């Protein structure tokens, strides 16, 4: 049995559903201790009832876009451990769908607060714990939209470009502390969020949801969806000692996205 993450301590934001929970499950299966936080009580309650909820899984309610909430979360985690091996900044929202002249400043502010500023809140507090650990890994969730842009999703695309900028800058700043920082760009994930994105885009363009689905799949050279567990596996690699020389990188787990439109 693969226990390559034995004794590793990992914090995952938005960790009770989607990519976050898929990643938590893979990490737990490899022997890690995992701290997950989420704003959604319904997902947290499901996780509490999951068979994997044992002595290596700790569950917290937290609004990642609220700095006071994040501060309180870290106070609770510090009662359990003074060190971290990895922070996974996974929290994010899809943001609005529409051309830029139809968007409001509130659309922008909400998307950036959740997708970018939350990374600052978590990273600032995690760095001392990673330093105490004499090194570790920070993994930031970006997107293909953070490389190519994404028509009708300008706040989302801008936020994911920002995540890559943060990643590369922190990799430079933290390397001397043996802290590696990388970004993952997931592709079109088959999951609840994509259901909402497809619905909104179909409504905006006045086409069928099936047509939008087909369009998303055709954007990749592998003509495939990506699954949440695929991202979890990449996270595990970037946490593990096998990736000890990898930092400042932007890793696509996306079936080779060719375009985004």
Protein language model features and the residues they cover:
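Short C-terminal tail/terminal secondary-structure segment
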Residues: 4, 94-97, 148, 235-236, ...
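Conserved glycine-rich cofactor-binding loop
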Residues: 16-17
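Substrate-binding pocket helix/loop in short-chain dehydrogenase/reductase
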Residues: 98-100, 104-112, 216
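Active-site helix of classical SDR
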Residues: 123, 159, 167
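Residue(s) in the substrate-gating loop at a strand-loop-helix junction
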Residues: 143
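Short, small/polar-rich loop/turn modules that mediate ligand/substrate recognition or access, typified
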Residues: 175, 180, 246-248
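C-terminal helical subdomain
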Residues: 183, 207-242, 246, 253-255
